[in-house]
């Protein structure tokens, strides 16, 4: 994935938003909560209406008139730069989906101030950078936010409140933190864990991490699947610090193998599969996430992790690295 300086700026934003939302609670007091916030709902609103990897016929029919066609056309023009999936994404997805979605801003002026702040940071780090495209995207975001807050968000919020209550009732009973810490040997150090529900984009990427303790999800999925994925994603977040460097290393490694096979999915698939594997172990049964990754070879990876575990390998990072190498060996590749 080609990176831009705005991707680095987006990383800086996620660090700041993590700090803002992290209450630094001790292990025994950690809460996992479902929340409704306008920012992530606005981002998915734009992504859905413009068709940037998200679609929702019911939502689009209801709200397509809330954004000018010319503005949607601007976003569509840069679809490849804004879309994301399977651990990859366009160079501006980090800024305009993940960073903006994880921020807090009360109106269009606050949104503009946030974007201007990080645009200045980008220009200081790389003087003379062409900002034409991000400026055009930012203008669409700023110009349409106040109208969204007035005409769309109140009903969208109301639509999600019943599911929010159901999720929080069950999340209070769940023991995800203790279960995952016991299974992995890792400790959670990022305070309360936030699930941000979004109304638009029924067909599109869900479970998108916005910072170290904040995730996002389409609100109205199968309840059993949603709870299984809440556990799955907490595992991803818990293991992220140890596996992220290996993930990047393996992305580079698989690209250099000199094969015509598409291996871009392997590092992502191995990580999702590892979380599925632990989730099954924690639950003592096959959980609903196990067969939900259509583009990941989860069953093969889980068999590999079974074998490595039987050899006495328990550390998630070691399971991940060795699991990828064994998977590549099955494909006739790697060392």
Task: Give the positions of each predicted feature.
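Long, mid-chain structured domain cores
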Residues: 77-177
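N-terminal mature-domain "stem" immediately C-terminal to a signal peptide or N-terminal signal-anchor/transmembrane
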Residues: 22-108
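Bacterial Sec-dependent N-terminal signal peptides
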Residues: 1-24
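Active-site scaffold of zinc-dependent metalloenzymes
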Residues: 196-227, 240
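Pan-zinc metallopeptidase signature
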Residues: 287-335
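Active-site recognition of the HExxH zinc-binding catalytic motif
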Residues: 227-245
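Auxiliary, metal-adjacent structural segments of Zn-dependent hydrolase domains
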Residues: 152-209
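Post-HEXXH active-site segment of zinc metalloproteases
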Residues: 241-271
